[in-house]
Amino acid sequence: MKLKAKYKQQSKVGKVVQVVSAVVDVSFAGKDLPHILNALECTINNEKIVLEVLQHIGDDIVRCLAMNSTDGLFRGAEVIDTGEQIKVPVGKSILGRILNVVGQPIDDLGPIKCDNFSQIHKDAPKFINQSTSRKILITGIKVIDLLTPYISGGKIGLFGGAGVGKTVLIMEIINNVAKAYKGYTVFTGVGERTREGGDLYKEMVGSNIIDLNKLENSKVTLVFGQMNEPPGARARVALTGLTIAESFRDMNEGEVLLFIDNIFRFTQAGAEISTLLGRIPSAVGYQPTLATDIGSLQERITSTKFGAITSIQAIYVPADDLTDPAPVACFAHLDATTVLSRKIAELGIYPAVDPLNSSSQILDANVIGQEHYSVATQVQEILQTYKSLQDVIAILGVDELSDDEKRIVSRARKIQRFLTQPFHVAEVFTGKQGRFVSLEDTIYGFKGLIEGKYDDLPEMAFYMVGSIDEAIEKSKTL
């Protein structure tokens, strides 16, 4: 009866006729069915279950996707059509809060007082309203700033298999960029570990990005649909986080940072839903609508004349296969890609970024400057030459190389080690204080390496240091 009172405006009332995991069929009398993507609500044991209409089946049945657990749901349960799509609170009232997929707070800080709500399904901004930026976003991480510079207002993907450091890297970027950032930040946890979300929240409270005493002074909103949640939550929570980021962008108060960890779980949830709906799977078992699902999300992550969204997304690579359809569907949408390699991680090189597989659209002399471009391309050439010589070294040994090749190998190994860096978020594991390296120091250090200024220093002097001055000091202790 409470639900009926809430939706007086000719609400449609239906009955549950079938429950199959997260997919629920609801029957409505008459032929006036709820629209596709409408939100339906059902209360079981004082818990509200939110359903989203996906299909019309026959004359009187709609097939829905549950946003939360269907435990306790039964045939005959009463369902109310809200008459609108899922809407979530937006604006400054949600700063410092943790929300779930339907915009409910899950941080035990009480209800959210908000008058502004926005639906999670939207079209991308019109082309005439979009804007582009060619400005570099400084992360303080040498390998990224030098070889795969990130675009302010662009889309960035961190690709990698299990356990190679995607989450640690995204946490370090949050630490280096979001803490010093004047705009707003939205972190969206999609199908990842609840523990990591808790650690991130505590870190943000500790660094005062979230001000528990005065939440409106906070600079971040967190949205979680973690791996223990139904596929409906994991498939829609990225849209919830994006909707909140869009609202901050359209407030015209500067750039917005949007972190998503992990886009693959969004794809994975879509595959689960597709199977439950009985669709014929495509390659490797993914949903036949894979490209559409990814495209509808990615095309909304864009900058407009009102403001910019800079998106940094972690993307899991199944079995370390970059040709898997899920990561392949993401590549075309991104402005910069950072590929993490297990082979590099096995060498103890952290962050385990593959400098030859990673790329950026703004690695261009007209954008980043001639000196930066020249140093970056020479570093890549040296590393590529070293890679091509590795088979010869493995069979014949270093002694069979020419003097020039030996010099290149020596510099390449030093460059490889100088690309490492101690992270602030990993201090508890490494015991080493994190380093933020300015772009000027990064270019200066690598320029000296490729010119041979530091040929006399041992390789280990360059391992896990910040600037080149630190490497010189370290060499004195070896």
UniProtKB/Swiss-Prot annotation:
Compartments, as annotated in UniProt: Cell inner membrane
Membrane topology: Peripheral membrane protein
Taxonomic superkingdom: Bacteria
Sites where the protein binds ATP: 160-167
GO cellular component assignments: plasma membrane; proton-transporting ATP synthase complex
Transmembrane segments: none
Its job: Produces ATP from ADP in the presence of a proton gradient across the membrane. The catalytic sites are hosted primarily by the beta subunits.
Protein name: ATP synthase subunit beta
Native source organism of the sequence: Orientia tsutsugamushi (strain Boryong)
